């Protein structure tokens, strides 16, 4: 990429799942960070990349209620995308509560890809199916 360029993409998370996940894996450092949350609260993941100069890059992952950062007027005008909501409305004088789980963990040698994250039996179970690696972490709460 040329210096001073950016890129922004969006992904609709699997509508068949109640709980979904986002992860970032650094295989060389063998570290993984991730989030698990309710798909009906955050159906979208936005990914943005910034290339401010030579040999420099910034990447962001954002689980969100909308596919792109647009004005409220544009979101209302455009409506749903792929039969999924593109906003959440908070009525006046009301509250909204959302929860998510976050994890940060070393991964075993040879763990190269996250295929799935499940919250089951009080544990987060993280799978790399191709390499037959599984990580189980204690979950602090349910969702």
Residue ranges and their predicted role:
Residues 106-143:
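Terminal connector regions
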